[in-house]
Curated annotation (Swiss-Prot):
Residues 248-258 have a biased composition (Acidic residues). Keywords: Cell projection, Coiled coil, Cytoplasm, Exocytosis, Golgi apparatus, Protein transport, Transport. Component of the exocyst complex involved in the docking of exocytic vesicles with fusion sites on the plasma membrane. It is found in: Cytoplasm; Cytoplasm, Perinuclear region; Cell projection, Growth cone; Cell projection, Neuron projection. Its main location: cytoplasm. One of its GO terms (cellular component) is perinuclear region of cytoplasm. InterPro entries: EXOC3/Sec6 (IPR010326), EXOC3/Sec6_C (IPR042532). This is Exocyst complex component 3. The exocyst complex is composed of sec3/exoc1, sec5/exoc2, sec6/exoc3, sec8/exoc4, sec10/exoc5, sec15/exoc6, exo70/exoc7 and exo84/exoc8. One of its GO terms (biological process) is exocyst localization. Residues 147-184, 259-281 form a coiled coil. Residues 260-285 have a biased composition (Low complexity).
Amino acid sequence: METVSLVPLEGLDDLSAQSAAIKKIEQNFSNIDSLASVTNHKISLIQQKKTIEAQIKNEVHSELEKSKKGLETLYKSYNRINRMDESFSDTVELCSETSNLIGHYQLIKKVNTVRVNLINILKEVDRLLTIPEKAAEIEQLLSDDLNLLEIHSKLRELERLHQKALKQFESNFEELEAIKEMFSSVPELSHRFENKIWNIVSNSIDIAQIKPAVLVKVAQIIEREKLHEQKQKEKKSQNSLISSEGIHDDDDDDDDTEVNLNNSNKQQNNENENSSSNNNNNYDINNEDEGYDRNRSNYGDRFLEVLIQSISGKFEPMFLNSHNDLVQTLKDVNKMVDELFIVMDIVQECYPPSYDLFNFYVDQYHTKFYSLFGSFSNLMESSHVNNNYQVVVTKNIPSAHILMLVEWVVKNYSRDLSRLGIQDISPPLLDSLDPLIKIYKMHIKQLMREWCDNIINNDNQNKPEVVDGQYCSLAPIQLFESVASQLDIAAATKCQKLVVGVMEEVVSALMYFQVQSITLLQERNHEIKLENVIAYVNNNSKCYDHTQTIVDKVSNILDSEHMGYLDFDPVLEGFLNVSKVATQAISSVIFRDLDECIHKFYTVEWYQEDLMQPIINTFEDYVTNDIQKYILENYLKRLALLLLDTLIEQLLAQLIGGKNKFNENTYKILSNDCDKLLDFFKKYLRLSVVTAKVQILEDFKQMITSSIDMVPVYFRSVINFHKDINERVVELVLYQRTDISKSEITEVLGQIKTIVETVHTDPTNPPTGIFSRMNIYQRGWFS
C-alpha cells in the first residue's frame, strides 16, 4: 500500500503531538460516513481549546503574582541588610569614641560585677533561710494523702535547691558542711515521701475503695517522674553525641565573662524556681537542672516491683499455712479473687490505660494461685510416698479436701474468670492439682480394692438369695453402688479430668474384681457351694448390664475427647469371662462326682455294666434339681454344651489311651452310649448340635469295628471337624483291635498320614483342639 504523507498541522511543531493529533483524527473519522460530523467535532475542539487556554492563562497569572511578591520581599531584605551594616559601623565608631569618656571604666565594670554577685548571693541566702519553713510545711502536708501533688512539687524544689547549693560550695569544705546541715531534713523528707508513694501503691486495692483520688495523684506523680527520666536520658544522649563530634566550650574566655555567665544562669534558675513555687500544682518538668540527678531508681520499673512485692506479701502466709489449714487458705484465695473485681472496677480506672493494670493483676494472681496449689499438691504427694511400694498413702489429706479444691478450681474460679471477661488463661490452674488428683486416684484404688475383697469374701460365706427364681447375691448391687457413688462424687466437681481419673481406677478395680473371682473359681471351686457358683454366673451377667448403665452415665458426663481416654470393653468382656469360668466351675463340680465312673470306661467294667446311665442320671439330678431352676436360661444351654464337650473329651481320652482290647460287644455298647447322650442332651440343646458333637464318637466306633479299608473314610469324617487329630491317634486306637494285623495297621497309617499332610499345610501353625490337649505322644500308652 502506498504511504500517504501527512500535512503538518498548524500550531503543532512537536512531532509526537502531531502524531497524537493524527491518530485522534483517524479514530474519529475512520470511514466516509463519519465525515458528516466534522463540523460538530470542530466546534467541540474549539471549545476545549478555549477552556485550556483560559486555565493556562490563570496559572501563569498566579505564578507571576507569586514571583512578584518574592522579588519585593527579597528587595526589602536586601535594603535591611544594608541598613544593618551601616548601623553596625556607626555603633562601632560611637563605642570607640565614648570608651575614653568614662573614667576608671575597668574598675566600674568590676564593681558592677561584684554588685550583681552580691545581689544574687543575698537572694540565695534569703531562699536558703526559708528551707526550714518549707520543710515544716511539707511535714504538715504529709498528714493528708490528698496533698501528694503539692508535696511532690515543693519537695522537688527543695531537692533542686539542695543540689545547686552543694554544687556551688563543693570547693569550700566548711560551707559545704553547713549546706549539708541546713538541708539535713530534705533527704529524710524525700525518703518518707517515696515510702508513702510506694506504700499507697502496695495498698492500691484497699485505698481504691476509700480514696480513689489518691491513686490518681500517685499515677500523676509517677508519670511526672517517668517524663523527667525520659528527658534526662535524651539530654545525656545529646551530650554524648556532642562530645563524640568534638564540640566544646571556648577555654579562652576571661574570668569576668565567666562570672557574668554564671550569674546570668543563676538569675535564670532563680526565676524558674520562683515560678514553680507560685504554681505548685502545675509541675513543669523543664525547670529541672540539667545536671541534677536524684539517684533514684526508674519509677516505672519501681512501680511494678512494688506491686509484685505487695502481691507476693499477700500470698506468703497462704504458702506457709496451706498445708495446715486448707479450708482457711481457700477462704483467703476467694478474697484474692474478689480483689480482682475491685481492680477491674476501680483500681485500673485510676491509672493510665497504658499500665494495663487489670491484666497485670490477673496474670500475677493466677501465677500465684498456680504456684500455691502446685506447691501444696507436691508437698502432699512427697509427704505421702511410701518408698518401699511407690504408692501414695492418703491418710494425711482428707479426700474431701481434694474434692473441695478441684471443685473450687473448676466451678468457682472458672465462673469468676468468665465474669472478669477472661476466656482463656495459661497455664490452666487445674494442672497444678495433678498430684492431688493422683493422690485421690490412689485413694479410690485402695478403697475400691478393699470393697472388692470384702464383697467377694462375704459373697462366698453367705447363701445366695433366690430372686425371680434365680440364685443371686448382693455382690453386683454392692459393687456397682460403690462405683456409682464414686462417679457421682467426682461428677459433682464438674471436673472431667477427675472423672476420667476416677473411672480409670474404677475400671482397674472392676478388672481386679474379675481376676479375683476367676482365681477363686478356678483354684478353689471345691470350697464354694454349688449355689454360690451358680450365683456367680447370674451375678456377672448382671454386672455386664450394670457396666453398660455406667458407660451410658459416664458418656453423658464427659465430652467425646475425655470419653476417648476410657475403655470399658475389657470390663464388659471380663464379666462375660467370669460367667464363663463360673460355668466351667459348675462343670468341674459335677465331673468331680463322675471322675471314678469315667475312668472305668473301655475297661473290663465297661463291658460288664452300663456306665453311661449313672453319668446321665448324675447330669439329670444336678440339672433338674440344683441348676435349671436357678440359672439364666442361656447359661443353662452353655452349661449343657460344656458338659457334653467335656464328657466326650474325657471319653475319647479313655478310648485312645485304653489298655484293653476291643471285642465283639464294643460296637453295641458304644452305640447305646451315643443314643443315651442324644436322648439326654437334646432336651437342653438343639438335636443338630448334639448330633454333631456326638458324631466323633460314632466315627471312632466305626474305626474300631469296621473293616480296615473303611478306617481312612471315617478318619476323614473326624478330621473335617477336628483338624488337630493325626495318625498317632489312629495308631493308638487300631492297636487295641484284635482282628487286624500289624502290617495292615502300618499300611492304613500311611494313608492316614497322607490325609493329615494334605490338611496340615502350615507346620509352623499347628491346629488346636481335643486331641492336641491329650498326652498321646508317650510310648507308655501302648500295652
